[in-house]
């Protein structure tokens, strides 16, 4: 029996101010997938995540998350936005930052956290190996520790799906290596979708890959094909696989 997809998108179109951002997107993400969506800056990757989250509505097409509409399933989705969107100088503890991941579930004008919420936050911090930093100010953490705190914030609600937007941008190589170790551990219990503009993403850490630049170019494996990358990046490439995929860009024709 074929597994029901965790994420199912059919013929999705989205435009902004008359400009088509996403064109005819079809996507199936299955349980346990670690799905990487590559593409250039401005190719629609963040927009696609926002559609999956139910933050914006498509012009046409259907989106189903775990069989329901995105807004009905939002509590089952963890979201890690780009790190630069966070103000790490804000005077808040690591635990308080993680607790903020539960704000969407609170009702009323005054939102308070219970002892049970604190237990959830500490569990998420322990999962990321930074429980000992719970009372530290977020501004005092290293870049890698801040990244772990942001991921813990996405995990505090015990999601079934984890979405990550450019998780390795602006981080150093050791932090990037730590991130992929974390990703491997999380993939044992949830479905993961990660978008990035970095074609050098470590393909050995994902199960499937697609390329997005307004249109989505997919291949039902983690193999990057020449057609996929040419379609997304609009640039001829050779793919050479020796354990880890590598790319060689042919010279661009001279500009007139």
Describe the residue ranges of each PLM region:
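The feature captures the beta-strand-to-loop junction immediately N-terminal to the Walker
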Residues: 38-40
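Helix-to-loop junction immediately C-terminal to a conserved catalytic motif
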Residues: 53
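Conserved ABC transporter NBD signature motif
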Residues: 61-77
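Conserved ABC ATPase "signature" region
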Residues: 99, 113-133
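Conserved ABC ATPase signature
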Residues: 137-141, 145
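Catalytic Walker B motif of ABC-type/P-loop ATPase nucleotide-binding domains
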Residues: 162-166, 171
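ABC ATPase nucleotide-binding domains
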Residues: 226-256
